[in-house]
UniProtKB/Swiss-Prot annotation:
Cited SMART domains: LIM (SM00132)
InterPro entries reported in the protein's UniProt record: Znf_LIM
Occurrences of domain LIM zinc-binding (ranges): 5-65
Keyword Nucleotide-binding: no
SUPFAM superfamilies xref list: Glucocorticoid receptor-like (DNA-binding domain) (SSF57716)
Subcellular location: Cell projection, Pseudopodium; Cytoplasm, Cell cortex; Cytoplasm, Cytoskeleton
Protein name per its UniProtKB record: LIM domain-containing protein D
CDD domains: LIM_Mical_like
Molecular function per GO: actin filament binding; metal ion binding
One Pfam family linked to the record: LIM
Known function: Binds to F-actin and may modulate the chemotactic response during early development and contribute to the maintenance of the strength of the actin cytoskeleton.
Amino acid sequence: MSNLGKCTRCQKTVYSQEGFIAVKVPFHRSCFKCEVCNWQLVLTNYKSINGKVYCANHYPVGGLSVTPEKTHTTSDDLVMKNALNAPRVETVNEQLRGGNEKPQTSTDDLVTKNALNAPKSNLVNNQVRGTSDSAPLTSADDLVTRNALKAPKSDLVNNQVRGTSEMGPQAGIDIVTANALKAPKLETMSGYQKSVQN
């Protein structure tokens, strides 16, 4: 059994299995208590100032002072030793990332096979938009152009309505003109209309 030294509280010898070192001095587990209230402390909940240990409630909080207070955070504490011996970030990153090794990749996995067999983006675009070598669709083959060519021409429709088609004027009198010629003639005399018989 190794001897850690004399306990600060009881002045008895502290062996490694019955005590520990905190604030650079040995304590028995049962002697590690708050200086004010004698509350049992452990290494995770104590505070120290000037070599004495306190609980969180009785830790002296002072204002400005002429004498400097020595707070305790050294590398001798168990918590600090564990923190100093913890693996470094660089070591963890090298272990996880594999350092400077090349990645192990193959084309045997399913995702890579599907990606290799997928249609290429320019092929899909050519199917949808047409190839860049072909001219734009302005020929008479599209539906809009065909319908526009089949539509009746506006001057042809107007000529048929007005009777001025290329066949020449109509010879003969139509019914409207014949009825107008047969209608009784009216004379106007001082605002009155009189019927005149032929």
